[in-house]
Amino acid sequence: MQKRLTLLGSTGSIGDSTLDVVARHPERFSVYALTAHRNGDKLVEQCLRFAPEVAVVGDAATAAHVEARLRAAGSRTTVLYGPQALVDVSKSDGCDTVVAAIVGAAGLAPSLAAARAGKRILLANKESLVMSGAIFMDAVRDHGAILLPVDSEHNAIFQCMPRDAAEHGGIAKIILTASGGPFRTREPATLVDVTPDEACKHPNWVMGRKISVDSATMMNKGLEVIEAHWIFGLPGDRIDVLIHPQSVIHSLVSYRDGSVLAQLGNPDMRTPIAHALAFPERVDAGVEQLDLAQIAQLSFEKPDYARFPCLALALKALAEGGIASAALNAANEVAVEAFLERRIGFMAIAATVEAVLDALPNRAPDGLDDVLAADAEARRLAAEIIAKAPARRVERTV
């Protein structure tokens, strides 16, 4: 039976890759809803190609622009806007599958709505679990939702895990691989001069600017450790991080009998997306087959926590529990935005996050509202810290 998709964040890199796979298999997948924030022109192009019933944008002005262009082209797609519209298309009876690809905390509410509606959720929005892991996973279990990870590392682990949950006791640990980003071998003393464009030049993956910066700081890998903790139910001390510059082995599962299972493939997000879309079947993703003879060599190294303090901060937040992970994520989003706008330097990202975690008392969250309150407080503190640190501002341009 054809799957009906709501694609949250259709104009981003995950959205592009998802629609590429969808277009290859029109007999398997159709689109119920596409959503974007303010990239209205790209959303219009997608709507004209995939003919969703609904399109959602962030504000009224963008909605008016999108609707005018769609009507002029003869499209009947309904255009909505605002956070509630995102929630509505995520829980609508018009879809059975929700691809959660909105970057950042903005993706939490619609992803949670999809879980509470019992949808099949392809999760690329790691912040949903970083901010409110217990709440989100409880919703998945309580409402019979199906959670399929789309992040390449978590999808790799999922593929290497036994299908029977009763066999999970045989797992010793899981190992998330990381490329090390663009600054893996750069002298740490020179990182203070890094520009946004340099930080966004990932050596292997094509990604959006925010996640590219997170990869450069390795905050992304720290968030993925937290995400893996919630998805796979393992404590932090059984989740390792391993630098693997070639990005061919996407993650590994180590078993108690000494076996290690790994998932390999070219670094292309269409592979995990196609796996999750068609699961438990396999379909063509348009990805070139891996040629190990051409690659010839795979290398590995332990992460340097002095070079990547954001990774250490994320692991600390996971160990502390409570609202620490939500605060970590919120402070990082504010700091990365400031860096991309050249208001702070690269190394100030970690410094800002650490200062917020030190200033905000940790506590056990009392429901989703408490998590959102912690998120708001961490954002306020991060903004204050950035505003009071003019010496860190970056004047250099590319």
UniProtKB/Swiss-Prot annotation:
Cofactor: Mg(2+); Mn(2+)
Alphabetized UniProt keyword annotations: Isoprene biosynthesis, Manganese, Metal-binding, NADP, Oxidoreductase
Gene Ontology BP terms: isopentenyl diphosphate biosynthetic process, methylerythritol 4-phosphate pathway involved in terpenoid biosynthetic process
Keyword Metal-binding in annotation: yes
Entry protein name: 1-deoxy-D-xylulose 5-phosphate reductoisomerase
Sites where the protein binds Mn(2+): D151, E153, E224
Binding site for 1-deoxy-D-xylulose 5-phosphate: K126, S152, E153, S179, H202, S215, N220, K221, E224
Catalytic activity line of the entry: 2-C-methyl-D-erythritol 4-phosphate + NADP(+) = 1-deoxy-D-xylulose 5-phosphate + NADPH + H(+)
Family from the record: Belongs to the DXR family.
Cysteines engaged in disulfide bonds, as pairs: none
Molecular function GO terms recorded: 1-deoxy-D-xylulose-5-phosphate reductoisomerase activity; manganese ion binding; NADPH binding
InterPro entries, per the entry: DXP_reductoisomerase, DXP_reductoisomerase_C, DXP_reductoisomerase_N, DXPR_C, DXPR_C_sf, NAD(P)-bd_dom_sf
Cross-referenced SUPFAM superfamilies: 1-deoxy-D-xylulose-5-phosphate reductoisomerase, C-terminal domain, Glyceraldehyde-3-phosphate dehydrogenase-like, C-terminal domain, NAD(P)-binding Rossmann-fold domains
Residues that bind NADPH: T11, G12, S13, I14, R38, N39, N125, E127, G208
EC number: 1.1.1.267
Stated role: Catalyzes the NADPH-dependent rearrangement and reduction of 1-deoxy-D-xylulose-5-phosphate (DXP) to 2-C-methyl-D-erythritol 4-phosphate (MEP).
Leader sequence residues: none
PANTHER family: 1-DEOXY-D-XYLULOSE 5-PHOSPHATE REDUCTOISOMERASE, 1-DEOXY-D-XYLULOSE 5-PHOSPHATE REDUCTOISOMERASE, CHLOROPLASTIC
Pfam families reported for this sequence: DXP_redisom_C, DXP_reductoisom, DXPR_C
Pathway linked to the protein: Isoprenoid biosynthesis; isopentenyl diphosphate biosynthesis via DXP pathway; isopentenyl diphosphate from 1-deoxy-D-xylulose 5-phosphate: step 1/6
